[in-house]
């Protein structure tokens, strides 16, 4: 069952000490590409520590381990098992920081597009990025609890150098939490600002249409009143009656427009 736990996407971060092994489950960041777009979210990553071996369990090929397999980690030795665990945790914390910087760059790109188009597509992209930041913040806080428990845990042997590395992991994780919070606040503020701009633009458009409707109503009323087929209509027998009616309509329309402009209805 413990081997299957990290395979559950909803599994929470925790540390579990048993008689023959210690289970550590943390959330790691990952990217999924759907319909040509990248989505950021987190998945569980399990580490099982026994007397002789270390097992890792994850739903996908984790980039946490890629750097170790490629030989890009300094002072990495398989026989230093405790240090190996802390190095994986450190790698995970730095991955969060890297992905947060990517999210920040993407939000800047989307913001530039919003300055030009203000389409629903850009707003949806901003919402997806904000959702990713919420996932990251929640996962990082869960990881923080596990790291603090790991600092007090004695089931995994630890040496002086290992303690320093674990402290570095905790510092990196706290930094990632702060960055996620800052980026989330900035993104929320940006979305609120653009929502206000869009709402203001809509109000201006509605006001403009209302003014146009009022102005165009004036000639309609004049021509309807003077165009009725009844006796006593002014200018009915005048050979220039049509042009007189047109002139009256035009003058009244200009007067209505001047009154509206004077009252600053466009502002």
Residue ranges, per PLM feature:
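Peripheral, non-transmembrane regulatory/ligand-interaction domains of membrane transport proteins
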Residues: 1-152, 156-159, 165-168, 172-179, ...
């Amino acid at each position: 069952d413990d081997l299957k736990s990290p395979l559950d996407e909803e599994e929470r971060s925790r540390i579990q000490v048993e008689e023959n092994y210690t289970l550590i489950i943390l959330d790691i960041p990952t990217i999924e590409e759907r319909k040509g777009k990248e989505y950021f979210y987190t998945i569980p990553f399990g580490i099982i520590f026994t007397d002789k071996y270390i097992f890792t369990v994850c739903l996908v090929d984790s980039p946490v381990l890629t750097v170790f397999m490629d030989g890009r980690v300094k002072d990495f030795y398989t026989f230093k098992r405790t240090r190996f665990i802390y190095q994986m945790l450190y790698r995970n914390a730095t991955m969060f920081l890297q992905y947060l910087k990517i999210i920040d760059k993407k939000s800047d790109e989307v913001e530039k597009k919003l300055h030009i188009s203000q389409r629903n597509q850009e707003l949806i992209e901003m919402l997806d990025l904000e959702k990713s930041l919420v996932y990251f913040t929640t996962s990082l806080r869960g990881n923080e609890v596990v790291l603090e428990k790991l600092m007090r845990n004695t089931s995994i042997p630890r040496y002086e150098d290992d303690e320093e590395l674990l402290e570095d992991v905790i510092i990196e994780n706290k930094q990632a939490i702060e960055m996620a919070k800052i980026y989330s606040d900035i993104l929320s503020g940006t979305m609120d600002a653009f929502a206000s701009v869009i709402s203001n633009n809509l109000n201006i458009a509605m006001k403009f249409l209302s003014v146009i409707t009022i102005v165009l109503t004036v000639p309609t009323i004049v021509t309807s009143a003077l165009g009725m087929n009844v006796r006593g209509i002014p200018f009915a027998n005048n050979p220039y009656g049509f042009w007189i009616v047109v002139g009256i309509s035009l003058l009244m329309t200009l007067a209505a427009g001047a009154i509206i402009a004077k009252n600053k209805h466009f502002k």
